Design a protein with these regions (language model features):
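Active-site helix of classical SDR
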Residues: 128, 163, 171
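Active-site loop immediately N-terminal to the catalytic Tyr-X3-Lys motif
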Residues: 106, 152-158, 215, 233
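Alpha-helical segment proximal to the catalytic Tyr-Lys
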Residues: 133, 175-180, 236
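Residue(s) in the substrate-gating loop at a strand-loop-helix junction
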Residues: 147
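Canonical Rossmann dinucleotide-binding motif of NAD(H)/NADP(H)-dependent dehydrogenases/reductases
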Residues: 7-41
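Short C-terminal tail/terminal secondary-structure segment
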Residues: 2-7, 152, 228, 239-256
Length: 256
């Protein structure tokens, strides 16, 4: 069996919470933090896949626990925080959970709009509040998963883009209000090859690749590496920042 890659021990004796951890960037981040020594609480609404990720981490010698939770509710965060206490105070919070409905603004229902903002934005706000005492005591770090579409619109994604833009405002606000005790940063992924691309036509996939300077899709593991850096002691003078992980997509779009 292939052995898991080892990256170091930046998170030894640390506890991390990762939401949206059943797949994609969230799963890759949970695995990366565990590989670097963290005890990780994974949260998602997908119990089957989330449990599988936690079991995979455990099988590789890591410490992980999965919690089924809706991050848009206080009850969901009570469940997550309780699970984290079994490991210890939270040092790193990665708010990565999101949902998206594809429709132009005039066809987006109020229910759809509110649900997307509840998960994508309110979930990050509630998570910060739920573990703030731990973060303050541990001088911890928060990483919010935004998107390149916080800056540049994408047809059919009004609520998604609005929520991702609002996350950047929340990032700056929390960094100012809770520094120097807590650092808060955001990553802005570009075209990352996750399961969401399975629903996209080959033509549109090729167009997205052509719009990157790197000439390819990114991987969830590459975003996880950026998140791990921002959550680590190597980034102690970085807060309120927005880190693009987009293969140069933003530069190409700006010059077009």
């Amino acid at each position: 069996m292939e052995q898991p890659r080892r990256y170091g021990d930046r998170f030894t004796a640390h506890t991390a919470v990762v939401t949206g951890a059943a797949s994609g960037i969230g799963a890759a981040t949970a695995e990366r933090l565990a590989q670097e020594g963290a005890a990780v609480v994974l949260a998602d609404i997908d119990q089957e896949r989330g449990t599988a990720v936690a079991e995979r981490i455990g099988g590789e010698g890591g410490r992980a626990r999965f919690v089924t939770a809706d991050v848009s509710t206080e009850e969901g965060w009570e469940r997550i925080a309780a699970a984290a206490r079994d490991f210890g105070p939270v040092d790193v919070l990665v708010s990565n959970a999101y949902t998206v409905d594809v429709a132009p603004a005039h066809e987006t229902s109020l229910d759809s709009w509110q649900r997307q903002l509840a998960v994508n934005l309110t979930g990050a706000f509630l998570g910060f509040k739920a573990v703030l005492d731990d973060l303050r005591a541990r001088r911890g770090a928060v990483v919010l998963t935004s998107s390149v579409h916080a800056h540049k619109g994408i047809p059919g994604h009004p609520a998604y883009a609005a929520s991702k833009g609002a996350l950047l405002s929340l990032c700056g606000q929390l960094a100012v209000e809770y520094g120097p005790e807590v650092r808060v940063n955001a990553v802005l992924p570009g075209p990352i090859l996750t399961a969401a691309w399975d629903r996209v036509s080959a033509e549109d996939r090729a167009r997205s690749v052509a719009e990157t300077a790197a000439g390819r899709f990114g991987t969830p593991e590459e975003v996880a590496a950026a998140i791990a850096f921002l959550g680590s002691h190597e980034a102690t003078y970085i807060t309120g920042a927005s880190l693009l992980v987009d293969g140069g997509w933003s530069v190409v779009k700006s010059s077009a």
